[in-house]
A protein has these predicted regions:
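Short, structurally constrained coil/turn elements
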Residues: 31, 74, 110, 121, ...
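A short acidic, helix-capping loop that chelates divalent metal ions and anchors anionic groups
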Residues: 45-50, 109-111, 161
């Protein structure tokens, strides 16, 4: 699964800068000397807030470690911009950031407006419901009814899949 599955956090933007960078960056970035990365920290283990020993939230996760590694490799300081998931896509489209790291899954629409790295994790998509409804809601056909509510994150591939496969359902994002 991708962070497309995760619930959206609040829409306030914030930036966190980490010190590293072992020299002058040789690549053009949004801000000289920095690698600016947008993320939506609501999709553990990729990006999320962990509470440190002092009780303070700190950005953590695989994508955050990878972003730091890339910044270090390039000799740049890392700046993380936190936004809602659909904000990551907007930040990329407006070229306000150098990278978006939020468990993004490539699809034709996204590939027409942005470049993707090689895939470093292969996930899948599935329907999720409470255990008591597992036998009742076990296919697209079973949930493609006007009295069934289907939820998916705004801007996600899952929202596209819900619209394509369950057009008669009450789809909310």
């Amino acid at each position: 699964s991708s962070s497309d599955d995760a619930a959206s956090n609040d829409s306030a933007n914030s930036a966190e800068t980490t010190e590293s960078g072992s020299g002058e960056g040789k690549v053009q970035t949004v801000t000289d000397g920095k690698l600016t990365v947008a993320t939506s920290p609501d999709f553990a283990p990729y990006e999320f807030y962990a509470i440190d020993e002092d009780g303070n939230p700190t950005l953590s996760g695989f994508d955050m470690d990878l972003a730091q590694y890339i910044a270090d490799y390039m000799g740049l300081e890392l700046e993380i911009v936190t936004v809602d998931f659909d904000g990551v896509l907007s930040e990329l489209q407006t070229k306000s950031v150098d990278l978006g790291m939020a468990g993004l899954s490539p699809d034709e629409k996204r590939e027409s407006i942005m470049d993707f790295s090689d895939i470093y994790y292969m996930g899948g998509q599935s329907l999720v419901t409470v255990k008591d409804n597992a036998d009742k809601y076990n296919s697209f056909e079973a949930i493609n009814k006007s009295d069934v509510t289907v939820g998916a994150q705004t801007g996600s591939i899952q929202l596209d899949l819900a619209n394509e496969n369950t057009p008669d359902a009450d789809i909310v994002s």
